[in-house]
Amino acid sequence: MAETMFDRVGGYSTINRVARAFFEKVPTSNFIASYFEDSDFTGLIRHHTEFLGSIMGGPTRYSNKDLEQIHRFMDITDAAFDEMVELMKDSFYQFHFEQADVNFIEDELLRRRRFICGSK
């Protein structure tokens, strides 16, 4: 069986550090900070770690329906989504992820845009 990106990068331990780095950037963003005001960052970091792990071949799965339900009433704009993707990419680069891996993760995030953006 081929090794997944999840396994190759060190699993949840590494991905959790990336998620923490992302959430350290959130308060400085003009586009996304307001979506996370009064949020439980501990829980968000855990969920983002699991979600990113799922994209990378880890054991947890998030369906498009799950994503849609989670973000249903957040009214996330395309500009905010784009900012999230850029901050996420920066966080992966901060931990020296390879360009091809970051490109793959970016593509997977962009593929899920319609399940995350807008009001439902």
Where are these regions (language model features)?
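Core of compact, soluble alpha-helical bundle domains
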Residues: 1-120
